[in-house]
A protein has these predicted regions:
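Short beta-strand segments at enzyme active-site cores
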Residues: 46-50, 84-88, 122-128, 178-181, ...
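Beta/alpha (TIM)-barrel catalytic core signal, keyed to glycine-rich beta->alpha loops juxtaposed to Asp/Glu
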Residues: 131-337, 342
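Active-site gating/metal-coordination segments in enzymes
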Residues: 95-127, 208
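Active-site mouth loops of central-metabolism enzymes
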Residues: 20-30, 93-105, 148-156
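N-terminal binding-site loop/beta-alpha segment at the start of enzyme catalytic domains
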Residues: 1-87, 104-108, 121
Length: 346
């Protein structure tokens, strides 16, 4: 597996990242262990998790469960030094800390909790799961209204978080900082504040990106290239839509859609025609649709590392195979044509 630089962090990571959010709900600990074993054997040594995982659904009873499973794997298998481990502090919400925003205090509490569950003494990449001020992600862009009572307080909080993160870096508890579900303004402001106060610089951003969700392609892409801030693309298969398993608006037993019928707002009148078109494109070119979708994210004009999640070893094996696929100019041109027809199906 090829290794790539994670922006300006000094970290080298595998060109695919292993997603973990189903471990503890859709997947048992034994199944998660098997996935980590396979990933390690195949060189996928960049792993992403979060303190609030597992999802599908998120619940107070399962918070921290995925990190615990990963920590148990390290305890049994060893090899913490072989893995570049990313996790996240939960943003404001009811599940983890009862509507407390990300702050200096909650940052330290969250880091120390993750370290205990992960059974490690350091986190390679520590990410802010979503901004305190809200976000247009999670299908909120259709009604997004940026209204802020106190912009100065927003900036003060950001600086406070960076200072606290700097302390944690100095203590060796985290190595690098990253963003998630962030906006271009937010990323630019985090970078500006870090430069002004000589504080840790955000090195990456984890946002949704796939053939069906391409909000990153314009302003974000420009910032990514000019600031050397790679995208960690979550949902490169659009929560399984691009695999074809839901084609025809079906709900197969045991799938994510059985637990979340609308796939977090992704099931719309437009999405199935778009999915059908991309499945047809893959078929016409003799490609596996999942591998085509993942390979697409790796051939963008900005640095992009797709996060591949799976509920079975067969799915994981196939997704890892996308690292060996290079899409032809003809395939990319056909993708561009379909994107014009279906620019934002959800």
């Amino acid at each position: 597996m090829k290794q790539v630089a994670l922006g300006r962090s000094g970290l080298m990571v595998s060109e695919l990242c292993l997603g973990t959010m189903t471990w503890g709900t859709q997947n048992t600990e034994a199944e998660a262990f098997a996935q980590m074993d396979m990933a390690t054997e195949r060189g996928v040594t960049f792993w992403d998790t979060a303190e609030m995982y597992p999802t599908n659904p998120v619940s107070a009873e399962t918070v921290g469960g995925t990190e615990t499973i990963i920590g148990n794997w390290f305890a049994v298998r060893g090899g913490r030094d072989r893995v570049v481990l990313a996790t996240k502090i939960t943003g404001k919400g009811k599940t983890v800390r009862a509507d407390q925003p990300i702050s200096a205090a909650t940052l330290r509490t969250a880091v120390e909790g993750s370290l205990r569950r992960l059974q490690t003494d350091y986190i390679d990449l520590y990410q802010l799961h979503w901004p305190n001020r809200g976000s247009y992600h999670f299908r909120q862009m259709w009604r997004y209204a940026p209204r802020f009572d106190d912009p100065a307080a927003i900036r003060d909080n950001m600086a406070e978080v960076l200072r606290a993160a700097g302390d944690l870096v100095a203590e060796g508890k985290i190595r690098a900082l990253g963003l998630s579900n962030e906006s271009v303004w937010g990323a630019a402001e985090w970078l500006r504040l870090a430069g002004v106060e000589n504080l840790p610089r955000m090195v990456s951003v984890q946002n949704e990106y796939s053939l069906l969700c391409r909000q990153f392609d314009t302003d974000w892409a420009e910032l990514s290239v000019l600031e050397d801030m790679p995208l960690l693309a979550y949902s490169p298969l659009a929560t399984g839509l691009l695999s074809g398993k839901y084609a025809g608006d079906v709900v197969p037993e045991g799938t994510r859609r059985e637990r979340t019928p609308d796939l977090g707002g992704r099931v719309t009148a437009q999405v199935f025609p778009a999915v059908s078109a991309y499945l047809g494109l893959a078929r016409d070119h003799g490609l596996d649709p999942c591998q085509m979708a993942i390979a697409f994210t790796r051939q963008r004009p900005f640095a992009c590392i797709p996060i591949i999640g799976a509920t079975t070893l067969a799915q994981l094996e196939s997704n890892i195979g996308a690292a060996d696929l290079m899409l032809s100019d003809e395939v990319l041109a056909d993708i561009d044509a379909l994107h014009r027809l279906y620019p934002a199906p959800y």
